[in-house]
Regions:
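Donor/substrate-binding cores of folate-linked one-carbon enzymes
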Residues: 1-95
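Internal anion-binding site segments
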Residues: 88-242
């Protein structure tokens, strides 16, 4: 605090590509997460950390901070500072609203970086997903594919992937796969290679095991997602802190 007030601060910090998060102890007041701050402890977010990883990192930090806060209250040597005093200049406060199904449904028209961070921020729960349908049969009920772990495919690596499968150019949402070792989906400026996934009705598995039972992957396509619009809703236009 004061950043990421709301229901899902860990998730949104990862979704937004932050490099630093932390734990805060604070006083309760009439509004949500706005009370005076007592203690704060930082925690680094590594480039491949998921929300689950950060949760596990923060647990021992939070436990120790609670002990220190209680001791400070008992000994009456802890100060409380208003949250406004932690805001630097024109710094914008980012919210952490409830995670919705619309946020979890991946919009492949977004950038590789944004999709990668979205998937990390929703893993392992509630989990980002895409919907698959056979090409030319878009009226059929789609199959949901949950996505737990990925890698970014950008620049020369992306061009090499296209060359490997005999493509010159692709539209966002196009499935790219050799049917054996990789399963990727094109974004606005590259692709996301999916490493750990779960098809509806199946167990969670890694890519090679998935492809062993998912024939002709490039004969499928994805449905339109909603995550990009949901992320835009959560992006503050200005600092509304008074």
């Amino acid at each position: 605090l004061p950043q990421y007030r709301g229901a899902a601060p860990i998730n949104w910090a990862v979704i937004n590509g932050e490099r630093l998060t932390g734990v805060t102890t604070f006083m309760i007041d009439k509004d949500i997460d706005t009370g005076g701050i007592m203690l704060r402890q930082d925690c680094r977010i590594e480039p491949d950390d998921t929300a689950g990883d950060i949760h596990d990192k923060l647990m021992p930090i939070g436990a120790q901070l609670v002990v220190e806060t209680v001791q400070g209250i008992i000994e009456r040597n802890i100060e409380t500072r208003v949250q406004r005093s932690f805001i630097q200049g024109s710094e914008v406060l980012k919210p952490a609203p409830k995670l919705t199904r619309e946020l979890c449904h991946i919009d492949w028209n977004d950038t590789t970086k944004n999709v990668y961070n979205l998937i990390r921020g929703l893993s392992p729960y509630p989990t980002a997903f895409t919907e698959l349908v056979p090409e030319g049969e878009e009226t059929k009920a789609p199959a949901q594919l949950k996505v737990f772990a990925t890698e970014k495919v950008e620049g020369e690596e992306f061009r090499s992937m296209l060359e490997h499968i005999g493509k010159d150019n692709v539209t966002p949402g196009t499935i790219l796969s050799d049917g054996k070792g990789f399963f990727a989906i094109a974004t606005a400026d590259g692709a996301i290679s999916i490493k750990d996934m779960q098809l509806a009705g199946k167990k969670r598995m890694e890519v090679k095991a998935f492809l062993a039972g998912f024939r002709n992957p490039m004969s499928w396509t994805t449905t339109a997602g909603t995550s990009k619009a949901e992320m835009e809703k959560a992006r503050p236009a200005s600092n509304t802190e008074e």
